[in-house]
Amino acid sequence: MSKPLNLEDKIQNAGGVVNMLRASNYGPPVFPGITPEFTSWRDEQHSWRTSVCLLELSYHMTELHIRGADAKKFVSQFASNRMDNLVPMRGKQLVLSDETGYLVSDCIMFCEADDFLRIAGPPTASNWLQFHAENTDLNIEVTRNENMIIPRERRDVFRFQLQGPNALDLVREVADDGLPEIKFFHIGEFNIAGHTVRALRHGMAGKPGFEIYGPWDALQAVRAKVEEVGARYGLRKAGSLAYATTGQESGWMARPLPAIYTGDHNKSFREWLPAKSFEGNASIGGSLVVNDVSEVFVEPYELSYGKMVNFDHDFVGRDALMARKTNARTKVTLELNSDDVFRVMKDSIIKKRPRTKFISLPIAHYATFQCDSIMLNGNRIGQSHM
């Protein structure tokens, strides 16, 4: 059997999508550049609820830069979001679907200028948009700024968030010449430690905050100033263990399975993706075992993204989303009984056969895409995603 060159080849060689994803030894998401814990993940979680927490984003997110006179027009072809109100110094949480209306990815888009859009998020979003950018006649140019899972010397910008009830006061104090008023999901520009930075006003852990970014060479000086002043505000830095739990705090589903693995309509994309791409290396794990991987796909409505689906423009997946607008499943939080959790953990360590599976803390994440069955009286009544 020849070595697969692209994702489509890899799927065929594995005998199907499910076989490929189940056989992969690629584990849960990796957050390079930061230690698992700076103090303890409990204290770090507590800080974004009671004081302020620094969440490092400089190393693990992929960026795609879209430049040109048609940058907005290009993105509007693939994003379900309203785009006619996009102006410089605003951000949007983009929702990207395939032709069948299932989610490919979400990501954050920063409108730096009328002809410059910065896409930041998982590689699935950048891959999807880059593929289509290479097949368009519109006046755009795209460049990638890769994450640091594979080590590299530098990136275009650093990026970190300050989240929690003390975040606003902290940012006001570290701003050299005062903090401009920044509305929700707007971007402001100011100086920290003599360096010009920008900040997107939004929350990631269910609390108010800022996402601050600026030139890579300013990272150490800006972060040092924030940490120095932050000590007075109870600042904690989040390690990778605590960082991975922020989605649960806000109800955001960080990494659902992208709907790109099936269908002739996505075949050319799979043939474009390298076999060793994120999508090609990814694994699926959990108790939800299916023969048809599309059973694991999710729709924007199911993720509470309905308010970001705007039908006043044409985009990929529009007709499918309109057809199933009222038939989506409902996203809820599954809260486990504490006594049951600790009983299962105890039985996984000291009980003789059969032992239970250990529930890893602070998050039970064992694969790239974690999908479990929710059972009631022996019947499956739902499925869970991280």
Region locations from a protein language model:
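Generic hydrophobic, aliphatic-rich segments that mediate packing or membrane embedding
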Residues: 62, 70-75, 92, 103-108, ...
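Short amphipathic beta-strand starts and helix->beta connectors
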Residues: 44-50, 96-106, 138, 191-200
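Conserved, structured C-terminal
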Residues: 1-27, 31, 36, 109-386
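Acidic, proline/glycine-enriched N-terminal capping motif
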Residues: 1-94, 102, 331, 373, ...
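Short coil/turn segments at secondary-structure boundaries
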Residues: 62, 66, 99, 104, ...
